[in-house]
Curated annotation (Swiss-Prot):
Chief location bin: membrane
Localization in the cell: Cell membrane
Entry function: ATP-binding (A) component of a common energy-coupling factor (ECF) ABC-transporter complex. Unlike classic ABC transporters this ECF transporter provides the energy necessary to transport a number of different substrates.
Protein's name according to its UniProt entry: Energy-coupling factor transporter ATP-binding protein EcfA1
Key word Nuclease present: no
EC number: 7.-.-.-
Positions of disulphide bridges: none
Gene name of the record: ecfA1
Originating species: Mycoplasma pneumoniae (strain ATCC 29342 / M129 / Subtype 1) (Mycoplasmoides pneumoniae)
Length: 274
């Protein structure tokens, strides 16, 4: 059972961020906790991926604070940040630097000063968790999309971070691979990890403990999926992709809609012109 009286794993407090004159994040405040599976959703350009870059220290907030287990993120505590946060991207190819999968996982452990035996034990353990034991001697770039994502997950697990971010990590996968990764997110939450998924995937959202809805850089709704997505009409108001919204509403609450195809196209056009 999630206990939100404890210290937040990650906390945004009044955060602002912009590129030049274009504000991407506006007065953003929220907390996420260990043992919590959180989905961040919103239309393209709503600020979702900017959140992951701020969390991982790739971007610096221009106002407000971001804390990881109570410690404010800054350029002076990058090591602390890397010890607590892992991220799996949409396309993990750029993360692969080893000749084999085993080499790739081992690379991230080199700064930990483990013995060779300890490192081997960790690699074998995370490979088993991610279901890639038979891939350890393969070349990462020759694997399928789903296999690459599982290798990326194993590499993150080897470092044992408390917070794991999935940034659109299932969007390019086939249905079977998607199911595998989504189930893994749930398992990680059950192990006590704080799992943050930036996604458009309906099934991911319905399995989350909490959903954050972003719109034009603002957090406009948050809560349990059944509370946030309580009607098709509400979903349309917050400028999420409408086909996604309608199917999600039906999935979560059994909501149906009589909107026809032409109305749908017109509605999408009006929303995206705003």
């Amino acid at each position: 059972m999630l206990n939100t009286n404890k210290q937040a794993a990650a906390s945004f407090q009044g955060v602002y961020f912009s590129y030049s004159e274009l504000p991407l994040i506006r007065n953003l405040s929220f907390d996420v906790f260990e043992g919590e599976y959180v989905c961040i959703v919103g239309h393209n350009g709503s600020g979702k991926s900017t959140i992951s870059k701020l969390l991982t220290g790739l971007l610096k907030p221009q106002a407000g604070t971001i804390k990881i287990f109570g410690k404010t993120i800054s350029s002076e505590n990058v090591t602390y940040l890397r010890n607590h946060i892992g991220i799996i991207f949409q396309n993990p190819d750029n993360q692969f630097i080893g000749i084999t999968v085993e080499d790739d996982i081992a690379f991230g452990l080199e700064n930990r000063r483990y013995t060779r035996e300890k490192m081997k034990s960790i690699i074998e353990d995370v490979a088993q968790q991610a279901g890639i034991t038979e891939l350890l001697q393969k070349e990462p770039h020759n694997l399928s999309g789903g296999q690459k994502q599982r290798v990326a997950i194993a590499s993150v697990l080897a470092l044992n971070p408390a917070i794991i971010i999935f940034d659109e990590s299932t969007s390019m996968l086939d249905p079977k691979a998607k199911r595998t990764i989504k189930q893994f997110m749930v398992e990680l939450r059950n192990q006590g990890k704080c799992v943050i998924s930036i996604t458009h995937d309906m099934e991911e959202v319905t399995k989350a403990d909490k959903v954050l809805v972003m719109n034009e850089g603002r957090l406009i709704r948050q809560g349990k999926p059944k509370d946030v997505f309580n009607s098709a009409a509400e979903l349309q108001k917050i400028r999420l992709d409408i086909p996604f919204s309608l199917s999600l509403s039906t999935k979560v609450n059994g909501v149906t809609s009589t909107i026809d195809y032409q109305q749908l196209i017109e509605a999408i056009g009006k929303l995206w012109k705003k």
